[in-house]
Amino acid sequence: MSKTPIPCIVGFGGVTPAGRASHNLSHTRITYGLESEQNKKDYIKSVLSLCNMADEIGESQSFDKFAADKEHEVLKNTLVRKIDKEFIKEKFWCYDYDLPANGGGQLPFRLNPTEYYASRQHPKALGMAVMGIADAFSDCGFDVRKTIDKYGRDKSGCFAGCAVMNMDKFSGDGLMSSYPMGKRASSKTISFTLPEMTADFINAYVTGSLGISGHFIGACATSQYNMNAGVELIKSGKSELVIVGASEAIIMPPAFIGFDAMGAMTTDKRLKDLQTLLGEGEELDYTKYCRPFGDNAGLVVLSLIH
């Protein structure tokens, strides 16, 4: 009998345009019309809690009634939709930019993960990583930190990061635009730009891990590459527990400029041409920006951590 350890997934989580990934909540949003009433109710509550909207509940109103009243609003402010440009520009951009594409996978409502912990000008992707790992821990069914302490911190690994780079005003975009705009670059921006900073943050802020960590970049397959690295680390016996994933926050001008130059991205013009071709009218339906099957207009940018 082989003595090679068998890797097992013991929990998963994250934050996506559909909300929390743990407990299959994001999947519930995708299949919302086919879900049971209880699953729908649980999903709506999860988004309202995630976005800290429970404070809006009236004194004589129950959470169930509040969630029922907010159902349409939650569905409207999740998944791919028209980007809330004013919010993203204020929070994450260095300069205004006339977007060729105004649809994308923005996090639910105006969710800003960096406001949920003591961040110090942290890029959005790193804030998403902290929120995402907390969500994953809630899905495990056991105390992850105690397990890490039991195995030893040198036996806990982490492979996570982004495919492009961290590119908001607190990272890559802030670094590269500071000099042309007559501003001073922060001493943090170049380090926050590094793709593997997600793994570094999880180790430093969450797990206190001293084990093997790193990051493999593979475009759309980045999380899969990191998963493979984690599997091999456990099989080798070098780690007992490994955190793997990816964190992307690329609803930023540099990403739009790059993907548009490639001719690979869905734009308002391409969507309008496609809608005309399919007889769907001239008013742009931003919820149909992403069409993975059949006729489509290209890729769609989004923010997610998983």
PLM feature segments, named:
Residues 191, 216-219:
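Glycine- and other small-residue-rich loops at beta-strand/loop junctions that grip anionic moieties
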Residues 223:
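Short conserved active-site loop signatures built around small residues
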Residues 238-242:
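Short, high-confidence coil segments that cap the C-terminus of an alpha-helix
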Residues 226:
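Active-site histidine-anchored catalytic micro-motif
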Residues 1-164, 170-211, 232, 247, ...:
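Conserved "HGTGT" condensation-loop signature of ketosynthase/thiolase-family condensing enzymes
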Residues 256-260:
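Short low-complexity, flexible loop/linker segments enriched in glycine and/or proline
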